UniProtKB/Swiss-Prot annotation:
Predominant location: membrane
One record GO biological process: potassium ion import across plasma membrane
Residues exposed to the Cytoplasmic side: 6-85, 151-286, 337-769, 821-840, 936-948, 1004-1020
Maturation propeptide residues: 1-5
Function of the protein: This is the catalytic component of the active enzyme, which catalyzes the hydrolysis of ATP coupled with the exchange of sodium and potassium ions across the plasma membrane. This action creates the electrochemical gradient of sodium and potassium, providing the energy for active transport of various nutrients.
InterPro entries: ATPase_P-typ_cation-transptr_C, ATPase_P-typ_cation-transptr_N, ATPase_P-typ_cyto_dom_N, ATPase_P-typ_P_site, ATPase_P-typ_TM_dom_sf, ATPase_P-typ_transduc_dom_A_sf, Cation_transp_ATPase_P-type, HAD-like_sf
Biased composition (Polar residues): 212-227
Binding site residues for Mg(2+): 714, 718
Protein encoded by which gene: ATP1A2
The organism's taxonomic lineage, starting at the top: Eukaryota, Metazoa, Chordata, Craniata, Vertebrata
Name this polypeptide is given: Sodium/potassium-transporting ATPase subunit alpha-2
Compartment(s): Membrane; Cell membrane
Modified residues (Phosphoserine): 10, 439, 450, 496, 559, 587, 672, 826, 940
Length: 1020
């Protein structure tokens, strides 16, 4: 980043004259950020570095120069991501998506009331009530959704912990602690074990310095840092330390080469906050649904408006009818139902360790077709564990299970005793204090990952390592360094009071070079060609499994030459380090989590492609991918085919290989077309040694294929990809704050298996929303048809506005919500992911089922009840046709019925309102059957069972509410609802039964003839 890419480039400093320019500028910036880190500071010699940054490498900057640079570059801090003001979030909830439909309904109601008030002396208040209720529904639901999201985002308020608070700099030769924000380019900085690196540094001197780069590159092993230039790629070279990574051990000095937003970490954070986030699938579904419902509402509204003008109504009356029909089509309760469904699912997911930040992401996870998963910590346990050992010329399997219930081997061999002693003594890792009651595998250790793995392995199989070390006290030690690649220590032997033992571990080939003999069955024998081949084969086999292999050897020092109290000199080496005895190998791996292979299998049967994207080594990545089933058994990569047929890789047709391992350096040179080719033609893909920017490129590639992509990540390096993906999933335990900020969902237990649970919940919520909507929309037909017949056939109004509201916001609410608790149908994880182009939340088939089939049967039930009651009161159906004008005439108090009885206006209205109540009750009765048939889309209700207790409660609740509204004293005045004869409740029963039988037969045909005509026309 140095001068070229660093200082002059500042994301914040770019402005353009006009809006269009700004957008182009922003796109250009993002493309700039997506490129690999451009930097040449790691290649410069120390003199060139000093000249470039005008700094004395021993004394640091002058205070004056530091102030000038600070004034020029600004503080060493990340620009916080732009946040949405709270009022904007609240308005989005009030006016977004579904709410718009209800607002339009409310405005139309007030308009209708205004027209009526202008025309009539005593206007009916129905439309006014309806408008107020609609507005109230939107406001209450909006507040509820806003509260839900605000609660989740509280958990997210972080980002502040990203920057280390203090830094140790050397200026004018003086060491001083300053606020990390005041560090400037060119500063000489010192870091030690436990510090966070305050800016991007070029190392000029170091002593055993190791840094943890896992949040940046995804490598779990601490990386050595030294002044040497070791790699072209600045992310891989040893002489650069990155802002906000942790120094684990040792000390180092370095020159600051970038600060704040210009650091590698800063670029990633800027990239993440600059990415455009697409709309969620469910938001698009709700938009599509609104268009459908609007069409369904406006078309009959306009048709009947024209018809009523033809029938001779005044145009003002026709406008009132038009508004009435449109409003009757608005499902008032549905907004609340959808919100509650999503909230319930989010709560259920939180119980299963998935924290959802925005409600709509719940469903996105269900429509996921590709998961790009990180390896370290998500698919694996993120703790190095001893996996295999080789001694006595045999490879033995160690126990890597989380509960230590796995493989065991014979621990009586004297060679194993020697090997375990070396691994325990030649080891600087220790358990942290106060963990006696915690199981060994879960204890925290101080020390490097490989040594901690050895410590736990020996503790489990041989008992306390501390006691072993106490019995064999250490008298000298040479720590591991990158030049000689071994670690050595000398101990007093417990089994021989006068002598010492020298124990050594390190890179296997280096250890073997020092050993002319090998220990087999406790006996030292010469290391001949045969044994060397055996060693080579074992080493290759373990290395091929992606494991990190260490060699162990020892030498019993002769007591004559090295008696107790001998002063061992580790600088001048006054003791032998050659002619040792080789004992064995131990190999370590970060093992897969127990539940992952099963979860990957579930993804496969659900049609979801799992791609591994990791910063780790290709061999390790491939081994883990095979271990968890991302590369399934029997599937080969190009390399495997070439090795099997013994031909060069260039001769293999890449299309023959189902699996594919792509190296980051190859990905760097690929065009988008080549990447698309790989994603299209290979079903099982592993990307290894990838950089953060490449993860983003991979996500965009998958999205170009039309996939809905979920990405998991824990490091800062993952945040751009998390933001760009359709759903970003961050890790709750190991995740950095930045990644949690960018994600839509957080896995509280860091376990890949929880994602699969999330996918199932997401699919379930989509299914259940469909069922809820189908249930809610069905009652629209028996609510609208009375109004239409009232206009066309001029009969007394069969169902009033107030009673419609009692259905939509009263009796239908709990049953509709209860469908959110419905268990999954048996095929939910066997289906292919939903195709967002063809499989809509509400499609034409659902509308035709709800309106054209079930809704019509319900309307018949309602009209049957209506005609029965009026006939019992003396008005036969033939007398009702055309009676409307006389019926509603306040001055007419002698209207005759079919038998010649005279009715006053008041008496007529009591009968009419009793009809409204009965029509309402019959809708409740037919909705019983509708609720039960909506439990399943394909299975029979008898297969699904009635285990949903909330649904049974919903049935009882809607019935109790209907009875209460009908029989409660005073309802005649408040809601104009009157008590019904018991027999009138039974009028709709046959229709309810008919709905149930009709739908069971339809589903039977669906199951018998999949893909047939019935499925094409009625499966929603």
């Amino acid at each position: 980043m140095g001068r070229g890419a660093g200082r002059e480039y500042s994301p914040a400093a770019t402005t353009a004259e006009n809006g269009g320019g700004k957008k182009k500028q922003k796109e250009k910036e993002l493309d700039e950020l997506k490129k690999e880190v451009a930097m040449d500071d790691h290649k410069l010699s120390l003199d060139e570095l000093g000249r470039k940054y005008q700094v004395d490498l021993s004394k640091g900057l002058t205070n004056q120069r530091a102030q000038d640079v600070l004034a020029r570059d600004g503080p060493n801090a990340l620009t916080p991501p732009p946040t949405t003001p709270e009022w904007v979030k609240f308005c989005r909830q009030l006016f977004g998506g579904f709410s718009i439909l209800l607002w339009i309904g409310a405005i139309l109601c007030f308009l209708a009331y205004g027209i009526q008030a202008a025309m009539e002396d005593e206007p009916s208040n129905d439309n006014l009530y309806l408008g107020v209720v609609l507005a109230a529904v939107v406001i209450v639901t909006g507040c509820f959704s806003y509260y839900q999201e605000a609660k989740s985002s509280k958990i997210m308020d972080s980002f502040k912990n990203m920057v280390p608070q203090q830094a140790l700099v050397i200026r004018e030769g003086e060491k001083m602690q300053i606020n990390a924000e005041e560090v400037v380019v060119g500063d000489l900085v010192e870091v030690k074990g436990g510090d966070r690196v305050p800016a991007d540094l070029r190392i000029i001197s170091s002593h055993g310095c190791k840094v943890d780069n896992s949040s940046l590159t995804g490598e779990s092993e601490p990386q050595t840092r030294s002044p040497e230039f070791t790699h072209e790629n600045p992310l891989e070279t040893r002489n650069i330390c990155f802002f906000s990574t942790n120094c684990v051990e040792g000390t180092a000095r370095g020159i600051v080469i970038a600060t704040g937003d210009r650091t590698v970490m800063g670029r990633i954070a800027t990239l993440a906050s600059g990415l455009e986030v697409g709309r969620t699938p469910i938001a698009m579904e709700i938009e599509h649904f609104i268009q459908l419902i609007t069409g369904v509402a406006v078309f009959p509204g306009v048709s009947f408006f024209v018809l009523s003008l033809i029938l001779g109504y005044s145009w003002l009356e026709a406008v009132i009818f038009l508004i009435g029909i449109i409003v009757a089509n608005v499902p008032e309760g549905l907004l609340a139902t959808v919100t509650v469904c999503l909230t319930l699912t989010a709560k259920r997911m939180a119980r299963k360790n998935c924290l959802v930040k925005n409600l709509e992401a719940v469903e996105t996870l269900g429509s996921t077709s590709t998961i790009c998963s990180d390896k370290t910590g998500t698919l694996t346990q993120n703790r190095m564990t001893v996996a295999h050992m080789w001694f006595d010329n045999q490879i033995r399997e160690a126990d890597t299970t989380e509960d230590q219930s796995g493989a065991t081997f014979d621990k009586r061999s004297p060679t194993w005793t020697a090997l375990s002693r070396i691994a325990g003594l030649c080891n600087r890792a220790v358990f942290k204090a106060g963990q006696e009651n915690i199981s060994v595998s879960k204890r925290d250790t101080a020390g490097d990952a490989s040594e901690s793995a050895l410590l736990k392995c020996i503790e489990l199989s041989c008992g306390s390592v501390r006691k072993m070390r106490d019995r064999n006290p250490k008298v000298a030690e040479i720590p591991f360094n990158s030049t000689n690649k071994y670690q050595l220590s000398i101990h007093e032997r417990e089994d021989s009071p006068q002598s010492h033992v020298l124990v050594m571990k390190g890179a296997p080939e280096r250890i073997l070079d020092r050993c002319p003999t090998i220990l087999v069955q406790g006996k030292e024998i010469p290391l001949d060609k045969e044994m060397q081949d055996a060693f080579q084969n074992a080493y290759m086999e373990l290395g091929g499994l992606g494991e990190r292999v260490l060699g162990f050897c020892q030498l019993n020092l002769p007591s004559g030459k090295f008696p107790r109290g001998f002063k061992f000199d580790t600088d001048e080496l006054n003791f032998p380090t050659e002619k040792l005895c080789f004992v064995g190998l131990m190999s370590m791996i970060d093992p897969p989590r127990a539940a992952v292979p099963d979860a990957v299998g579930k993804c496969r049967s659900a049609g979801i492609k799992v791609i591994m994207v990791t910063g780790d080594h290709p061999i390790t990545a491939k081994a883990i991918a095979k271990g968890v089933g991302i590369i399934s058994e029997g599937n080969e990569t190009v390399e495997d085919i070439a090795a099997r047929l013994n031909i060069p890789m260039s001769q293999v047709n890449p299309r023959e290989a189902k699996a594919c391992v792509v190296h980051g350096s190859d990905l760097k040179d690929m065009t988008s077309e080549q990447l698309d080719e790989i994603l299209k033609n290979h079903t099982e893909i592993v990307f290894a040694r990838t950089s953060p920017q490449q993860k983003l490129v991979i996500v965009e590639g998958c999205q170009r294929q039309g996939a809905i992509v979920a990405v998991t990540g824990d490091g800062v390096n993952d945040s751009p990809a998390l933001k760009k993906a359709d759903i970003g999933i961050a890790m709750g335990i190991s995740g950095s704050d930045v990644s949690k900020q960018a994600a839509d969902m957080i896995l509280l237990d860091d376990n890949f298996a929880s994602i699969v649970t999330g996918v199932e919940e997401g699919r379930l919520v989509f299914d259940n929303l469909k069922k809820s909507i189908a249930y809610t929309l069905t009652s629209n037909i028996p609510e609208i048809t009375p109004f239409l017949l009232f206009i066309i056939a001029n009969i007394p109004l069969p169902l009033g506005t107030v009673t419609i509201l009692c259905i939509d916001l009263g009796t239908d609410m709990v049953p509709a919500i209860s469908l959110a608790y419905e268990a999954a149908e048996s095929d939910i994880m066997k289906r292919q992911p939903r195709n967002s182009q063809t499989d809509k939340l509400v499609n034409e088939r659902l509308i035709s089922m709800a309106y054209g089939q079930i809704g019509m049967i319900q309307a018949l039930g309602g009209f049957f009840t209506y005609f029965v009651i009026l006939a019992e009161n003396g008005f036969l159906p033939s007398r009702l046709l055309g009676i409307r004008l006389d019926w509603d005439d306040r001055t007419m108090n002698d209207l005759e019925d079919s038998y010649g009885q005279e009715w006053t206006y008041e008496q007529r209205k009591v009968v009419e309102f009793t009809c409204h109540t009965a029509f309402f009750a019959s809708i409740v009765v037919v909705q019983w059957a509708d609720l039960i048939i909506c439990k399943t889309r394909r299975n029979s209700v008898f297969q699904q069972g009635m285990k949903n207790k909330i649904l049974i409660f919903g049935l009882l609740e809607e019935t109790a509410l209907a009875a209460f509204l009908s029989y409660c004293p005073g309802m005649g005045v408040a809601l104009r609802m009157y008590p019904l004869k018991v027999t009138w409740w039974f009028c709709a029963f046959p229709y309810s039964l008919l709905i149930f039988i009709y739908d069971e037969v339809r589903k039977l045909i669906l199951r018998r003839y999949p893909g047939g005509w019935v499925e094409k026309e009625t499966y929603y």
